[in-house]
C-alpha cells in the first residue's frame, strides 16, 4: 500500500535527519545531505502534509469512537489556555497578503512549537501509539524540509526549553480522563487546522 511504502521511505529519510528524539539543535541547522532533499519538491511536500493529515484524521476518529470526543469540545477551547500555535494574518500565509518567506518561517516555527504538544500526546494518548509517533517524526521532517526553502534559515527559532517546560506543566495539570481526552482532541484539531493552512499556502504561486 502507498501509505506503508511512504511511511518506510519517510523513516529512511528521517533516520539520518533526526538521529535522536530530542529537540532540534545543531543537527537541525547544518545538514543538507542529498537523502534529505528527497521530499523537497512541492508535490512531495504536499504528499507529506497529506500523510500527516491522514494520521491525524484516523486518530481523531479513534477518539470519537472510543471516548465520544467528536465535535462537542469546542467550548472547552476557551476554558483551556493551551497556547496552541495558530496562523494569523501577519504570518503571510493567507491568499490576501501572501508572503512566501514570512509564511515558510511561520510554518516551520509553528511545527517546532507543536513538538511539545506531540510529546504530551506520546505520553497520554492511549490509542495507536505508532500513529502519534509517525505524526511527530513526520512533522519534524516537514519542518526540516521547509527550513531548507527559507532564504535565511538561521532566523528560524526553536522553542525556548523553559517555555516548553512551562507548557508541559500546564498540559499535565487537571489531567483527569475527561480533561486529558479533551486536550488531546484539541491538540489534534489545532494541528490539523495548522497543516491545512500550510497545505493551502504552499500551493499559492
From Swiss-Prot:
Keyword presence, Signal: yes
Single annotated GO MF: growth factor activity
Signal sequence extent: 1-21
Cellular compartments annotated: Secreted
Keywords: Acute phase, Cytokine, Disulfide bond, Glycoprotein, Growth factor, Phosphoprotein, Secreted, Signal
Chain positions with Phosphoserine modification: 73
Major subcellular location class: secreted
GO annotation terms (biological process): acute-phase response; glucose homeostasis; hepatocyte proliferation; interleukin-6-mediated signaling pathway; liver regeneration; positive regulation of multicellular organismal process; positive regulation of receptor signaling pathway via JAK-STAT; positive regulation of receptor signaling pathway via STAT
Assigned GO CC terms: extracellular space; interleukin-6 receptor complex
Family matches, as InterPro entries: 4_helix_cytokine-like_core (IPR009079), IL-6-like (IPR003574), IL-6/GCSF/MGF (IPR030474), IL6/GCSF/MGF_CS (IPR030473)
Glycosylated sites: 164
Disulfide bonds: 64-70, 93-103
Subunit annotation: Component of a hexamer of two molecules each of IL6, IL6R and IL6ST; first binds to IL6R to associate with the signaling subunit IL6ST. Interacts with IL6R (via the N-terminal ectodomain); this interaction may be affected by IL6R-binding with SORL1, hence decreasing IL6 cis signaling. Interacts with SORL1 (via the N-terminal ectodomain); this interaction leads to IL6 internalization and lysosomal degradation. May form a trimeric complex with the soluble SORL1 ectodomain and soluble IL6R receptor; this interaction might stabilize circulating IL6, hence promoting IL6 trans signaling.
Family: Belongs to the IL-6 superfamily.
General function of this protein: Cytokine with a wide variety of biological functions in immunity, tissue regeneration, and metabolism. Binds to IL6R, then the complex associates to the signaling subunit IL6ST/gp130 to trigger the intracellular IL6-signaling pathway. The interaction with the membrane-bound IL6R and IL6ST stimulates 'classic signaling', whereas the binding of IL6 and soluble IL6R to IL6ST stimulates 'trans-signaling'. Alternatively, 'cluster signaling' occurs when membrane-bound IL6:IL6R complexes on transmitter cells activate IL6ST receptors on neighboring receiver cells. IL6 is a potent inducer of the acute phase response. Rapid production of IL6 contributes to host defense during infection and tissue injury, but excessive IL6 synthesis is involved in disease pathology. In the innate immune response, is synthesized by myeloid cells, such as macrophages and dendritic cells, upon recognition of pathogens through toll-like receptors (TLRs) at the site of infection or tissue injury. In the adaptive immune response, is required for the differentiation of B cells into immunoglobulin-secreting cells.
Protein name listed in UniProt: Interleukin-6
The species this protein was found in: Orcinus orca (Killer whale)
Gene behind the chain: IL6
Amino acid at each position: 500500500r502507498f501509505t506503508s511504502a511512504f511511511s518506510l521511505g519517510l523513516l529512511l529519510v528521517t533516520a539520518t535527519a533526526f538521529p535522536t528524539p530530542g529537540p532540534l539543535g545543531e543537527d537541525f541547522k547544518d545538514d543538507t545531505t542529498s537523502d534529505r532533499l528527497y521530499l523537497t519538491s512541492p508535490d512531495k511536500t504536499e504528499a507529506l502534509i497529506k500523510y500527516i493529515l491522514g494520521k491525524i484524521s484516523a486518530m481523531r476518529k479513534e477518539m470519537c469512537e472510543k471516548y465520544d470526543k467528536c465535535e462537542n469540545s469546542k467550548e472547552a477551547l476557551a476554558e483551556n489556555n493551551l497556547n496552541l500555535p495558530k496562523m494569523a494574518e501577519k504570518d503571510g500565509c493567507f491568499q490576501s497578503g501572501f508572503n512566501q518567506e514570512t509564511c515558510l518561517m511561520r510554518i516551520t516555527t509553528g511545527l517546532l512549537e507543536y513538538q511539545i504538544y506531540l510529546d504530551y500526546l506520546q505520553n497520554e494518548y492511549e490509542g495507536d501509539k505508532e500513529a502519534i509517533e509517525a505524526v511527530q517524526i513526520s512533522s519534524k521532517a516537514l519542518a526540516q524540509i521547509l527550513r531548507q526553502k527559507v532564504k535565511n534559515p538561521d532566523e528560524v527559532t526553536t522553542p525556548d526549553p523553559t517555555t516548553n517546560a512551562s507548557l508541559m506543566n500546564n498540559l499535565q495539570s487537571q489531567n483527569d480522563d475527561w480533561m486529558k481526552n479533551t486536550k488531546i482532541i484539541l491538540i489534534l484539531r489545532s494541528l490539523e487546522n495548522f497543516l491545512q493552512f500550510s497545505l493551502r499556502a504552499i500551493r499559492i504561486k
